[in-house]
Amino acid sequence: MGDYFAWDFANISGSNTSGSLNLNQLNLDNINNGLHNQEDGAGGRNENSERVGSGSPGSVSMQVLSLFSAVNSALATLEKSEEFPSVVKDEQSIFPAVAKASNSLDELAQNIIPAPSPPGFNRKRKTFDEDSSVEMIRRAISDHLDLLNNCCIGIANLNEDSVHKISLTRSGKPSQLVTVSCRHSSVIQKSYGSEKRYLCPPPMVYINGNYSSIFNQSFRTEISIMNDFGQCSQPISEEYTGQGCMIFRSLHISSLVAAKSKNLRLSLDMFSNVNNQLLSHLVTSSISIVSKPSKKGSKLKISNITLRSGSVVSLYNRINSQTVRTKYTSIEAGQFCLRGDRWVPLRINLLLPDENGKLKVCDDVDNPEPIKYGSIVELVDEATGTTSDPLIIRRVEKDHIAEEDGYVNQMHRIVLESAYPISNVRHLKIAEHSSLAYSNNISVRWFLGATSAQNRNASSEAILPIEWEAVGNLSSNEMTRVGDSVCWTIVGISHFDCTMMLPFNQNPVPTVTDYPYIEEPPEYLESSRSLQFKIGGYSVGLQIWLGVHGPLSYSFTAAADTSTMGTVTLGLSQISYDPSCAEQKYPLLFVIPGGIVIIGKCEILLTSSAFGN
């Protein structure tokens, strides 16, 4: 779900109308009065005969009264099912107090007092006659349209300051959009036997927007690792207290979950702390399982774990292979630093010299260049704009710098050497213990290091700077030996973002189904004037909208061995052409049965070309 698309398609004119069914309300009060008048005129009853029995007139009157009440409730439900068939199921689940229909007259007689009607089905029925659920969704989409289009442009740069900002809609009201973002490693190292292989870096979950509209004020997030067969590891729980970000440092993979699986996913469940109710269920993009990185062979082979220019990565430093002494790269006050409790995704850009010899970012988006060892790169934090000095990326083998060949793959152990003389670097300071290198008659090379940050007295919450550290050789022909303090493990980072909103003034219906997402770019089918695309997280009752147009007619063909993934063919005949607009952009939206609107992160561009204009 991390990719964003925009397509240019022809707009199709059409209209969609729906009728409504009106039923006269039964006057139960008049019926009740008539029954009592019949009983009063019968006469000849004593006190004992007034007791209601199974065959007495009083019993029959109560049965008939309850029967009329049940019929009235059923007719009201039938009217709504005719007028709003797509939301009846949701309304019944939202209002559990609706009386269950009975087939037996004796069962009806037990309900002397008719069950109260839910708020949406009162006698006047204002809520759904005057303001249907479809219209509420349409108005909410229209009010949030500018924000929805922005959601389709790209990933928001998240940090602990930005997650608390709530945008305003067209009407000036606070936005109801809520974004759940998960940043996690794109590979997991395989676990053998009973060992615990922790995810590095640990997954981080951001909550952005008016989260109380969907998740309530007090909730927790449970995250677990799920394999291809739906088996999950022991979940790790974190309370959300408005801090914007949750980090799951204890999450690890076991050999049982990873057995016979090629890919894993993270399962995120949000639960209310008030009643332990499931509020949301999300599944991230796939995570590849890799064995221990090979040190020989396939150096010149590009694989799915090869890093390219523009890849998003995380770097961490570990001393003596100890998990407790793992520090992650972060940004603080515009400076690169190390922390044990937080990390920041960084974009690694390949730098190539231009015709004037000046280093320039290789920014071929369509065909990003694979990064080879010995290349010059830079690290960029897009949230703050912080950029490193030019660095030469080199591989480490057996505590020595290896030859400059092969491609940079994830989970490799690397060093980052200054591409310029140390006097020309800008962003980082020189470590105090490295100042002695100037006074010795040895060949000195400068690397990014973590000696100060790995001080044993520093807490995991401490924020300590990354510094330049000198590594020297007594002979220029000698292989450079490096310690753990200047060695880094590089890992690719994947992201999962789900933006949603609830148009109704009520809590959503809990659902354990995956939220829908687009797997492949839509394709326009000119013959049928429709869009076709692959979807994941499909569930029965799903609605599909293009902006304010919806729900649109579509067909779903499930893939083999699954009911949640398949191909959707979406008709466009319900969308009317607007001659005042040369092109019309619509965000692709999903409405799940619980009433939550899910942003599909895909913008469809409709033009007038199919109409000959």
From Swiss-Prot:
Pfam families assigned: BTD, LAG1-DNAbind
Region (Disordered): 32-58
Chief location: cytoplasm
Subcellular localization, as worded in the UniProt entry: Cytoplasm; Nucleus
Leader peptide range in chain numbering: none
InterPro entries named among the record's database cross-references: Beta-trefoil_DNA-bd_dom, BTD_sf, CLS_fam, p53-like_TF_DNA-bd_sf, RBP-J/Cbf11/Cbf12_DNA-bd, RBP-J/Cbf11_DNA-bd_sf
Keyword line: Cell adhesion, Cytoplasm, DNA-binding, Nucleus, Transcription, Transcription regulation
Molecular function terms, GO-annotated: DNA-binding transcription activator activity, RNA polymerase II-specific; DNA-binding transcription factor activity; DNA-binding transcription factor activity, RNA polymerase II-specific; RNA polymerase II cis-regulatory region sequence-specific DNA binding; RNA polymerase II transcription regulatory region sequence-specific DNA binding; sequence-specific DNA binding
Annotated knockout phenotype: Leads to cold sensitivity, slow growth, and altered colony morphology.
Induction: Expression is fairly constant throughout the growth phases of haploid cells and similar mRNA levels were found in vegetative diploid cells.
Single GO cellular component term: cytosol
One biological process term in Gene Ontology: positive regulation of transcription by RNA polymerase II
Disulfide-bonded cysteines: none
Protein family membership: Belongs to the Su(H) family.
Biological function: Transcription factor that behaves as a negative regulator of adhesion. Recognizes specifically the canonical CSL response element GTGA/GGAA. May also play a cbf12-antagonistic role in the regulation of a number of other important processes such as extracellular material production, colony morphogenesis, ploidy maintenance, or meiosis.
Record's protein name: Transcription factor cbf11
Lineage: Eukaryota, Fungi, Dikarya, Ascomycota, Taphrinomycotina
Gene: cbf11
